[in-house]
């Protein structure tokens, strides 16, 4: 069923606590050359992703590209990073359950975010615990789209260039045989970038992924 995800245990695929902290953090967007601060889940809009993902709500999200890309590509005046609005974290945030401030519950003091993350399955269950059958099902039902849209001028005329990075963690069973997990959409680019840095003549200091 298209809504079966509502009853599935939420698991972002990495540290649940860090995921909630990121979602509940204010962030920035570069607008006309100046950074503008947005609240958590600010800038809500609908975005049309390629099928089968389709139309989804997206919001501003705390991510490094907001700062790295203007430093890498000189002249950039407008830039934002938006993430699809994960419903479970959005509801947790609205209820105050992403707070790291401790509250007193009977005779115990506890941070709401620690209660939530204690109930969420650990990420290793998702990373290393998936069976081939589960991965085959995910190949057919779970999809990821990452879209980069660049607008500017080319030859004096307005120009927009769009790049789409579809689901990287498929086919799941084959990736699991090679890497031990199918969730490689963060680790594989990181490993590839590390190899590129070793092979390229790069300046000393911090190297942004955008520079590669």
Enumerate the language-model features and the residues they cover.
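C-terminal catalytic/substrate-binding lobe primarily of soluble NAD(P)-dependent oxidoreductases
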Residues: 1-212
């Amino acid at each position: 069923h298209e809504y079966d995800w509502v009853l599935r245990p939420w698991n972002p695929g990495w540290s649940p606590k860090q995921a909630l902290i990121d979602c509940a953090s204010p962030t920035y967007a570069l607008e006309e050359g100046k950074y503008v601060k947005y609240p958590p889940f600010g800038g809500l809009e609908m975005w049309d992703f390629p099928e089968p993902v389709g139309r989804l709500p997206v919001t501003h999200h705390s991510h490094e590209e907001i700062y790295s890309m203007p430093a890498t590509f000189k002249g950039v005046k407008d830039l934002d990073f938006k993430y699809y609005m994960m419903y479970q974290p959005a509801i947790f945030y609205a209820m105050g359950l992403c707070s790291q401030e401790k509250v007193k519950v009977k005779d115990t003091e506890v941070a709401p975010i620690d209660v939530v993350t204690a109930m969420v399955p650990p990420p290793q269950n998702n990373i290393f615990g998936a069976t081939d059958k589960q991965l085959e099902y995910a190949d057919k039902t779970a999809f990821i789209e990452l879209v980069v849209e660049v607008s500017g001028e080319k030859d004096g005329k307005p120009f927009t260039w769009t790049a789409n990075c579809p689901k990287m963690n498929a086919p799941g069973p084959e990736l699991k045989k090679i890497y031990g997990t199918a969730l490689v959409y963060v680790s594989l680019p990181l490993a590839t970038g590390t190899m590129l840095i070793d092979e390229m003549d790069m300046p000393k200091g911090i190297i942004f992924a955008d520079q590669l």
